[in-house]
């Protein structure tokens, strides 16, 4: 189901779970889980349906061979009667019985005594019956059956084969468990299996699990393969301190190959009945999805609650493309009350945007309208863009020749009526640039020159200024250079190479007075290793930072020459300032860091080793105060699809007392072929408090599995903890009962992709 992507404009201090190594590919995952399932279930019960060309069965000339103790032939009728340990074979069809009566003209086989019949994709036993071998039809009395789809098997008082794709059963028991193990069993008065549609339909059915009858249903449909189809999806059952009992019963409607919808009725004990829905569509020229939720008269909030999302995109003639992304909520607490993850529940804004764009050769143009819904009343509203028009040119790259670039933008910035104290207006920004990249195997040199002209037309001047049409023009000059040194060596019989890559980056931007310019969409960039090589310390056009500085950095790599894998990359760098930085976001801002002659030391490393091990880190050290300012370190191990262990640590100090120091542990650990442990612990060292604790256990057999999980989370400072329990049952070939645990794990544990069952 679609998830709205809220945005925290002020910068979320929460972060994703511990990193994991790149891990197995999709093909490796598929092969691994298939092999694990074979280990649990043993060999297939029947020959796969695609093992032979079944069209040959329908040809009268396809020969049959018979081995029997006695053969009787009625020449006038063209019928055979075989008796005594009869074995009849025709292509992949194999029949055993004490007596077989065969009409050669029609291909019909009558079976008055117990028999065993096998063909690709099907195995039957019965007390009596008849089979039409050329047409894949027949009837069986008191029979047992096995199909290759998901190891389906069962027994029925009467069994009718309509053709190779459709079959009907009366007084039938159905399961996907191995013979001798009937952990779950569906007993129905009537069952229809449609292999062409991949659908099973049972009427007047009892479902029994571990010899305990659980429920009766007059009618139920279920998938017998992996295709999508209309019907009930997995009901969800959960309980939490906040909501009490929480039950969802989603219904999927496969309207057409390019349309589908999901209706999600949900009952929340302490709030009431909520109705959610999603509609997806796909056409040649456009596609998209609509999503909404509505809760009338929330019992706790005493008001109607709702959420709306529209994501639409398409193509127009002459290469034009458009998209619209609209997100709205009834109130600022909606995501906190009904969201499922830390990102959703801590988000501060919802974005709505419409855009039209095109590209011709080296030109790209776009028109955009952007609005925001602020979910936190304590935060200022972001500026709306009504509209934003851009035209950008980027010339082709040709070795040894200059490359030209031009970015132009016009934007009208507006605010809701409640923000009358902040300036509104228009901004025109023009930024031409030329650079010349000289590259050799041993190094490179890239000089560049840029100009940025920004002009405003304001409804009211910036406080403290009197100019409604301020403007600013500022040039920037930079030179980026680097050298490459390498040293081949041998490590434990493996050919390797180590590189040493010094890099020097110089940038000069003269100071221009900018206090009379508004701050519409500009902020100071986060400073990590990549920031050492930026020409501007600000994002957005409202400020261009003055600069006269040199960055010196060093990178080393260890590369496996055999497979090309980069086992280790480590970098260290620092900026040396030739003068103080004068340009700030606001005149009253005074940052001690802007008066220093050197920046913090910045370091980063990444190591990806054989066996699915990944280590990754970024670090920022303040040499003036001799302390760490910021860092993130992650260690992951993902050697196979069902094993994932990750640990992470993040810290950030010195931001007006809002220190962040968090640790994150996450793991999915198999305990043999049947059990798996699942856990995550996100802990705030700064607050000495757990932000989220998740623990669970999964048990699987050949034909069913269960996952039980508990979660305890804090969703804000001073908030009461919320405890919830999630339970998931999945029955192979029938469906699942889920509380959303799979989606939750994919959101919470980085690298968790779900389990093929």
Curated annotation (Swiss-Prot):
Stretch forming the signal peptide: 1-21
Quaternary data: Component of the lipopolysaccharide transport and assembly complex. Interacts with LptE and LptA.
Function comment: Together with LptE, is involved in the assembly of lipopolysaccharide (LPS) at the surface of the outer membrane.
Family: Belongs to the LptD family.
Main location class: membrane
Protein's name in the database: LPS-assembly protein LptD
GO biological-process terms attached to the record: Gram-negative-bacterium-type cell outer membrane assembly; lipopolysaccharide transport
Keywords: Cell outer membrane, Membrane, Signal
Transmembrane segments: none
Subcellular location as annotated: Cell outer membrane
The gene coding this protein: lptD
Pfam families named among the record's database cross-references: LptD
Protein's organism: Alkalilimnicola ehrlichii (strain ATCC BAA-1101 / DSM 17681 / MLHE-1)
GO-annotated cellular components: cell outer membrane; transporter complex
């Amino acid at each position: 189901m679609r998830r709205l992507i809220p945005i925290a404009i002020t910068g979320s201090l929460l972060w994703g779970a511990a990193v994991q190594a790149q891990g197995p590919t999709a093909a490796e995952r598929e092969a691994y889980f298939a092999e694990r399932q074979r280990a649990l279930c043993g060999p297939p019960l029947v020959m796969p349906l695609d093992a032979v060309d079944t069209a040959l069965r329908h040809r009268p000339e396809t020969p049959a061979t018979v081995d029997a103790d006695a053969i009787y032939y009625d020449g006038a009728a063209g019928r055979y009667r075989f008796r005594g340990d009869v074995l009849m074979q025709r292509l992949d069809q194999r029949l055993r019985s004490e007596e077989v009566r065969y009409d050669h003209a029609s291909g019909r086989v009558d079976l008055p005594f117990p028999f065993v019949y096998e063909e690709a994709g099907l195995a039957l036993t019965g007390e009596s019956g008849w089979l039409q071998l050329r047409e894949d039809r027949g009837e069986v009395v008191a029979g047992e059956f096995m199909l290759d789809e998901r190891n389906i098997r069962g027994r029925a008082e009467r069994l009718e084969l309509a053709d190779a794709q459709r079959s009907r059963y009366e007084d039938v028991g159905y399961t996907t468990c191995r013979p001798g193990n009937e952990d779950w069993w569906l007993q129905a008065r009537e069952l229809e299996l449609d292999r062409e549609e991949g659908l099973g339909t049972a009427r007047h059915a009892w479902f029994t699990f571990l010899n305990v009858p659980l429920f009766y249903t007059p009618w139920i449909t279920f998938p017998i393969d992996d295709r999508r189809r209309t019907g009930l999806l997995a009901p969800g059952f959960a309980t939490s301190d906040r909501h009490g009992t929480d039950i969802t019963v989603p219904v999927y409607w496969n309207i057409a190959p390019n349309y589908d919808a999901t209706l999600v009725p949900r009952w929340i004990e302490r709030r009431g009945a909520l109705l959610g829905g999603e509609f997806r569509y796909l056409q040649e020229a456009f596609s998209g999805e609509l999503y909404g939720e509505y809760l009338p008269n929330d019992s706790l909030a005493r008001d109607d609650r709702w959420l709306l999302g529209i994501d639409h995109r398409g193509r127009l003639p002459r290469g034009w493309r458009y998209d619209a992304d609209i997100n709205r909520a009834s109130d600022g607490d909606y995501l906190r009350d009904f969201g499922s993850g830390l990102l959703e529940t801590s988000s501060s804004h919802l974005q709505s945007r419409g855009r039209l764009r095109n590209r011709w050769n080296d030109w790209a143009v776009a028109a955009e309208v952007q609005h925001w819904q602020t979910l936190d009343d304590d935060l200022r509203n972001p500026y709306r863009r009504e509209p934003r028009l851009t035209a950008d040119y980027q010339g082709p790259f040709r070795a040894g020749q200059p490359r030209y670039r031009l970015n132009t933008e016009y934007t009208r910035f507006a605010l809701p009526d409640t923000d009358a104290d902040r300036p509104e207006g228009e901004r025109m920004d023009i930024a031409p640039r030329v650079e010349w990249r000289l590259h050799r195997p041993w190094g490179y040199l890239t000089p560049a020159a840029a100009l940025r002209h920004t002009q405003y037309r304001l409804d009211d001047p910036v406080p403290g200024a009197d100019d409604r049409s301020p403007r600013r023009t500022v040039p920037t000059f930079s030179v980026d250079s680097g050298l490459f040194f390498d040293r081949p060596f041998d490590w434990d019989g493996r050919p390797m190479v180590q590189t040493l890559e010094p890099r020097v980056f110089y940038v000069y931007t003269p100071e221009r007075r900018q206090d009379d310019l508004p701050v519409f969409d500009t902020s100071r960039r986060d400073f990590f290793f990549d920031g050492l090589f930026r020409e501007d310390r600000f994002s957005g056009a409202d400020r261009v930072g003055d600069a006269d500085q040199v960055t010196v950095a060093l990178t080393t790599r260890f590369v496996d020459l055999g497979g090309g894998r980069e086992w280790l990359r480590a970098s260290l760098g620092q900026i040396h300032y030739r003068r103080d930085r004068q340009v700030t976001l606001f005149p009253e801002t005074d940052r001690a860091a802007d008066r220093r002659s050197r920046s913090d030391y910045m370091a980063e490393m990444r190591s990806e080793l054989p066996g699915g091990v990944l280590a990754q880190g970024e670090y920022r050290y303040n040499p003036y105060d001799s302390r760490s300012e910021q860092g993130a370190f992650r260690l992951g191990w993902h050697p196979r699809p069902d094993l994932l262990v990750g640990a992470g640590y993040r810290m950030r100090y010195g931001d007006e007392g809002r220190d962040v120091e968090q640790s994150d542990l996450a793991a999915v650990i198999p305990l043999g072929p049947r059990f798996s442990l699942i856990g995550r612990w996100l802990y705030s060292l700064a607050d000495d408090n757990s932000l989220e604790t998740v623990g669970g256990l999964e048990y699987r057999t050949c034909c069913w599995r269960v996952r039980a999980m508990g979660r305890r989370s804090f969703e804000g400072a001073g908030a009461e903890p919320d405890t919830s329990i999630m339970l998931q049952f999945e029955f192979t070939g029938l469906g699942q009962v889920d509380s959303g645990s799979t989606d939750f794990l994919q959101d919470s544990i980085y690298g968790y992709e779900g389990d093929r069952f």
